[in-house]
UniProtKB/Swiss-Prot annotation:
One of its GO terms (molecular function) is structural constituent of ribosome. One of its GO terms (cellular component) is cytosolic small ribosomal subunit. CDD domains: RPS2. It comes from Shewanella baltica (strain OS155 / ATCC BAA-1091). GO terms for biological process: translation. It holds the Pfam family Ribosomal_S2. Keywords: Ribonucleoprotein, Ribosomal protein. This is Small ribosomal subunit protein uS2. Belongs to the universal ribosomal protein uS2 family.
């Protein structure tokens, strides 16, 4: 089972919150104290809470569930995309479009258009167009890929959201809440943990901390998927009993 230790978190700077003047009182139970005007997060809480979240994600993946990684802050985007791709899951790394979950019907149409344009770009259709028309379609393709590329093969709503930065991604969290989709989120000392089913109190800005979260979630999803494949193989008669 994928787990993260206290040492891992200390080395990544997970315990460094925001300046005390920007704190959200709802995070008080998870704050150890303050140092040089910066809140220190109590990792005695974070370690078990994150490991519980990882176990949940692994369980979702073991049942063929879809994990949607969400992190549109500049510091998070790259790690979110890399980690989601590494475990064959899905991501939003650029901008959360309002209605991405709650208006899935419309989003599905946009994904259909994205796939049409992708086909046209490789089957020679673009070459037959005027220069202006080809440029317009190329721009449309790039725009759609940027906003929907990470969910184009999701094939329906996700089974869990993994979010870096609860305050920054509050719209995504609210949409998930409206649809009853569980939310795992990293919540810093300046944020409210409202609407988050699995709270991970921790720094949501430092690259090392973000990479620790995303790589751990990817590993948990992979482990869960591995269990699913092992069960499937056994059912298909590929695994011989000793």
């Amino acid at each position: 089972m994928t787990t993260v230790s206290m040492r891992d978190m200390l080395q990544a700077g997970v315990h460094f919150g925001h300046q005390t003047r920007y704190w959200n009182p709802k995070m008080k139970p998870f704050i150890f104290g303050a140092r040089n005007g910066v809140h220190i997060i109590n990792l005695e809480h974070t370690v078990p809470m994150f490991n519980e979240a990882l176990a949940f994600i692994s369980n979702v993946a073991s049942k063929k569930g879809k994990v949607l990684f969400v992190g549109t802050k500049r510091a998070a985007g790259e790690a979110i995309k890399e980690s989601a791709l590494s475990c064959d899951q899905f991501y939003v790394d650029h901008r959360w479009l309002g209605g991405m979950l709650t208006n899935w019907k419309t989003v599905r149409q946009s994904i259909k258009r994205l796939k049409e344009l992708e086909s046209q770009s490789v089957d020679g259709t673009f070459d037959k167009l005027t220069k202006k028309e080809a440029l317009m379609r190329t721009r449309e393709l790039e725009k759609l890929e940027k906003s929907l590329g990470g969910i184009k093969n999701m094939g329906g709503l996700p089974d869990v959201l993994f979010v870096i930065g609860a305050d920054h991604e509050h719209i995504a969290i609210k949409e998930a809440n409206n649809l009853g989709i569980p939310v795992v989120a990293v919540v810093d000392t300046n944020s409210a943990p409202d609407g988050v089913n699995y709270i991970v109190p921790g720094n949501d800005d430092a690259m090392r901390a973000i990479r620790l979260y995303t790589s751990s979630v990817a590993a948990a999803a992979k482990a869960g998927r591995g269990q699913d494949l092992a069960v499937q193989a056994e059912q298909d008669g590929f695994v011989e009993a000793e």
